[in-house]
């Protein structure tokens, strides 16, 4: 594993994005300004000016879908090392049993951490920063001039920055200080304006292949080259972190020769907000890296052994000239390791996060979009607490089981109040998730999944003498290509087979090995002829690094074939012959963490933006109160259009009444549905929005809901993309009181024990010969069925939900199914079936003799599993004869065709034609 750690991972950053696939840059859909994008599409003729609001939205969705389909997004914006860091933090979170204070990359907990950010401003020959041709049509963040001092205040001021109409808006520094309880801050400098060598469209123009920006990274490199010659910047001030621990000493707070946090501002509106005068040729705001370290020639760092003692840059974020704090703080959140929380593929009408988090739509909150970004989700604050340390959350952790013994009453303060309890985590029993079904039988061998694994299974194997010996098995694998490897070993050395590769781009020394994806179960074979006549150690191992934990390796039905004769080694059924060190037997499912995070939201501090959300030129609000987040780690995305009601993160909507547009009858998007997701004692504020073509959205159900119970349906059947499917464990959360200003609420958490309703076992069977196919129609009205046990009446059993099986003998059999629910209650259903061997077709044949034109024919037909019960002859003149033999006079000499049809005692028919020559 040291080889992986020091060689493979050290090269990961420099090479991860070097292939042609990543010549373009990603898009961040979390910073989309839909209204401005629609205006751009109208302005450029892609949408008719008189199009209806519905048609405009459809056109916008198509525009975004094209970018998603052709380009790349989501975690593609993170390099290998950044993903590894995130994985380490998540591992710490999963292991916490209480208000644990582990910090992975933090300073001493008593210190306030201030990170250094360097902002570079760069314009274009055809679009200077002081002559950018912007108008109110392009942006609400319109200034006469965009001086460097504006960005200095926007990012680093402790007093805010001046808005276009003289307002005082929150700076990025103030946002992070508020969210962290003043335990984390940023400082830095805005340098420039520099000037690019080419016109703006060269950098932001979209690739024909991906429809994403072609040369945005080239613009970043040009800005860095000019930075290297700028005498006003002391680069050593911006190298105080070793973000990826390049020297492996565990110290993340030391120089590494790389600029810590780099922000680029270009002289146009971003494409995500219409692109200003450039339209689609503007750069789309994003977080990314430069593919390989870019060295700032002529500079001198404090790390002489790296980059020839010069500074370099790698990670960056890029924002538009008119950026507000929301976009900057969102992209900087990525730089701290946070993923996007929205539906990164736009699969449906929106995920149930929306404006509730800056890492979704909350970056665009405010009367002027982006000037009042909303707070982080509880999940994001939990992540930052464990990665940075400080006071992002002041939380209590409870388990569902301890609530059964004693209910708890908690005063939960608004999420912006970090000095008092502002989050409650409720852990649940592990969630059982359907996985990879075995290739055959009930079990297969599984490597398990995870970071930094060194898993193995082994056993002695005696290989008989022979000329050709082959190990054969079924394999299913999904392994991070070029980074993680599974291997077959003989006496500790890896051997090659038909599913292995010799590709080893990072010189790990682990090949031949299995890497990449099999796309289903495949037949594997490995030549063991060199060890014929010997007893060897057969082993499988699975070696992974950090960052991206893919499914791993499954192995089933291992056989040894010597000179054509096969013997079973192990099929994972019964007691295994393998010794396990990390590998396990797997029955086609795995377990995942899931839990609730309780957060109190208000319209105070950074959450003022929840009261000022602009849609269709009108303001709406997200309601204050108790927000219940449900985290489900069995999912890695929020693609709710593909799995409605399910995803890795979302809020439980307290108001299950769907909002519908009056004119079209269309169910509104999730951003409108979850406006009232909070549980509260106070009725909701009214909502009424009217579009330009008179379509009205009005919320007619404003009654408060103060109680959550996990036995209720929160899947939002009318608007399923906004719903959350939760599991019933008896969790009940009651809001007892809340302050008039919504600064806190008093919450009672309990586990309610109710009499379990037993499951109902039911099934249907389809019999074909000796084979039987089952359809399981069992149900559990108040929970989930967690196990199935079939008895086929012949000594065979199965734990699959809907198995298919075969009998070896005909006869009557009683098939029994026993189902057990998540509370331990069971039910049994039995059905008797009759099976028979498949009927063999009768074999038709005949002989004949003739005397002149007199012909006698007789059937010699047989039936191997019965008897012939009907014989029919069709003569040349069309007449029909029946019986095993007949005599008839044929009309002429020559060649004649006689058709013989025979039927057996089970109705099978065979017909042949007999040639008669007279």
Swiss-Prot record:
Essential cofactor(s): Zn(2+)
Main location group: secreted
Residues that hold Ca(2+) according to the record: 757, 782, 821, 825
Residues reported in the UniProt entry to bind Zn(2+): 330, 334
GO CC aspect terms: extracellular region
Keywords: Autocatalytic cleavage, Calcium, Cytolysis, Hydrolase, Metal-binding, Metalloprotease, Protease, Repeat, Secreted, Signal, Virulence, Zinc
Enzyme class: hydrolase
PROSITE patterns attached to this UniProt entry: PKD
Propeptide regions on this chain: 24-105, 835-918
BP GO terms, sorted: killing of cells of another organism; proteolysis
CDD domains: PKD
Catalytic residues identified in the record: 331
Known EC number: 3.4.24.-
Cleavable signal peptide: 1-23
Example GO molecular function: metal ion binding
Family recorded in the similarity comment: Belongs to the peptidase M6 family.
Record protein name field: Pre-pro-metalloprotease PrtV
Species this chain originates from: Vibrio cholerae serotype O1 (strain M66-2)
The organism's taxonomic lineage, starting at the top: Bacteria, Pseudomonadati, Pseudomonadota, Gammaproteobacteria, Vibrionales
């Amino acid at each position: 594993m040291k080889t992986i750690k020091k060689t493979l991972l050290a090269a990961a950053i420099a090479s991860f994005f070097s292939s042609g696939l990543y010549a373009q840059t990603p898009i961040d859909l979390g910073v989309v300004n839909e209204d401005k994008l629609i205006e751009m599409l109208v302005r450029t003729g892609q949408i008719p000016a008189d199009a209806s609001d519905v048609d405009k939205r459809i056109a916008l969705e198509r525009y975004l879908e094209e970018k998603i389909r052709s380009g790349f997004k989501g975690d593609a914006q993170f390099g290998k090392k950044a993903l590894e860091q995130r994985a380490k933090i998540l591992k710490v979170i999963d292991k916490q049993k209480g208000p644990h204070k582990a910090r992975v990359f933090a300073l001493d907990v008593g210190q306030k951490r201030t990170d250094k950010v360097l902002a570079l401003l760069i314009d274009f020959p055809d679009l200077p920063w002081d002559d950018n041709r912007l108008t109110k049509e392009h942006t609400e963040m319109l200034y006469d001039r965009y001086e460097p001092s504006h960005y200095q205040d926007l990012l680093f001021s402790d007093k805010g920055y001046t808005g276009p109409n003289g307002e005082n808006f929150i700076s990025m520094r103030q946002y992070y200080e508020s969210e962290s309880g003043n335990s984390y801050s940023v400082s830095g400098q805005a340098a420039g304006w520099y000037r690019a060598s080419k016109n703006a469209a060269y950098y932001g123009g979209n690739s024909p292949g991906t429809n994403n920006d072609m040369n945005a990274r080239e613009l970043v490199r040009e800005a860095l080259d000019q930075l290297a010659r700028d005498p006003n910047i002391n680069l050593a001030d911006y190298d105080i972190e070793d973000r990826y621990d390049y020297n492996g000493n565990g110290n993340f707070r030391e120089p590494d020769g790389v600029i810590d946090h780099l922000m680029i501002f270009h002289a146009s509106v971003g494409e995500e907000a219409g692109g200003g005068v450039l339209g689609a040729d503007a750069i789309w705001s994003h977080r990314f890296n430069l593919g390989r370290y870019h060295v700032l020639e002529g500079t001198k760092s404090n790390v002489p052994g790296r980059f020839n003692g010069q500074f370099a840059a790698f990670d960056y974020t890029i924002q538009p000239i008119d950026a507000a704090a929301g976009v900057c703080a969102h992209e900087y959140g990525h730089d701290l390791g946070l993923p996007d929380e929205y539906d990164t593929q736009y699969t449906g009408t929106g995920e149930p996060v929306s404006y509730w988090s800056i890492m979704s739509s909350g970056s665009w909150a405010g009367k002027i979009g982006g000037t009042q970004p909303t707070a982080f989700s509880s999940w994001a604050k939990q992540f930052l607490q464990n990665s940075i340390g400080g006071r992002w959350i002041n939380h209590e952790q409870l388990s569902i089981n301890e609530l059964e013994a004693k209910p708890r009453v908690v005063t939960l303060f608004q999420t912006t109040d970090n000095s008092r309890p502002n989050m409650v985590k409720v852990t649940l029993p592990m969630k059982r998730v359907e996985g990879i079904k075995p290739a055959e039988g009930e079990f297969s061998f599984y490597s398990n999944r995870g970071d930094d694994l060194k898993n193995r299974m082994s056993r002695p194997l005696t290989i008989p003498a022979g000329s050709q010996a082959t190990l054969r098995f079924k394999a299913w694998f999904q392994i991070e290509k070029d980074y993680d490897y599974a291997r077959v070993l003989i006496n500790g050395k890896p051997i090659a087979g038909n599913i292995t590769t010799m590709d080893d781009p990072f010189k790990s020394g682990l090949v031949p090995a299995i890497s990449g994806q099999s796309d289903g179960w495949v037949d594997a074979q490995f030549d063991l002829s060199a060890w014929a006549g010997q007893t060897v150690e057969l082993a499988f191992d699975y070696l992974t690094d950090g960052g991206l934990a893919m499914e791993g390796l499954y192995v089933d039905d291992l056989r040894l074939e010597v000179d054509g004769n096969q013997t079973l080694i192990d099929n994972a059924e019964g007691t295994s012959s393998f010794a396990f060190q990390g590998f396990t037997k797997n029955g086609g499912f795995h377990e995942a963490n899931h839990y609730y995070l309780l957060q109190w939201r208000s319209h105070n501090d950074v959450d003022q933006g929840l009261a000022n959300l602009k849609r269709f030129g009108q303001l709406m609000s997200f309601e204050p109160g108790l927000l219940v987040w449900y985290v489900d780690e069995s999912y890695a995305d929020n693609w709710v259009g593909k799995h409605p009601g399910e995803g890795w993160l979302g809020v439980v909507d307290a108001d299950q009444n769907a909002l519908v547009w009056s004119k079209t009858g269309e169910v509104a998007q999730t951003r409108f549905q979850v406006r009232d997701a909070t549980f509260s004692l106070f009725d909701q504020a009214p909502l009424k929005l009217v579009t330009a073509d008179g379509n009205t959205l009005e919320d007619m159900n404003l009654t408060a809901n103060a109680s959550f119970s996990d036995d209720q349906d929160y899947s939002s059947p009318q608007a399923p993309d906004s719903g959350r499917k939760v599991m019933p464990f008896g969790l009940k959360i009651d809001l007892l009181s809340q302050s008039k200003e919504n600064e806190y609420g008093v919450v009672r958490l309990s586990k309610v024990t109710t009499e379990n309703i037993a499951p109902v076992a039911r099934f249907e069977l389809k019999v074909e010969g000796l084979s039987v196919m089952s359809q399981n129609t069992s149900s559990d009205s108040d929970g989930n069925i967690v196990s199935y046990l079939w008895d086929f009446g012949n000594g065979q059993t199965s734990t699959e939900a809907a198995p298919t099986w075969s009998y070896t003998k005909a006869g009557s059999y009683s098939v029994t199914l026993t189902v057990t629910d998540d509370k331990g209650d069971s039910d049994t259903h039995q059905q008797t079936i009759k099976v028979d061997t498949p009927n063999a077709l009768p074999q038709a044949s005949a002989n004949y003799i003739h005397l002149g034109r007199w012909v006698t024919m007789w059937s010699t037909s047989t039936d191997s599993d019965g008897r012939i019960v009907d014989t029919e002859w069709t003569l040349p003149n069309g007449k029909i004869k029946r019986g095993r033999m007949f005599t008839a006079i044929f009309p002429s000499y020559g060649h004649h065709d006689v058709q013989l049809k025979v039927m057996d005692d089970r109705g099978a028919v065979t017909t042949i034609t007999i040639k008669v020559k007279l």
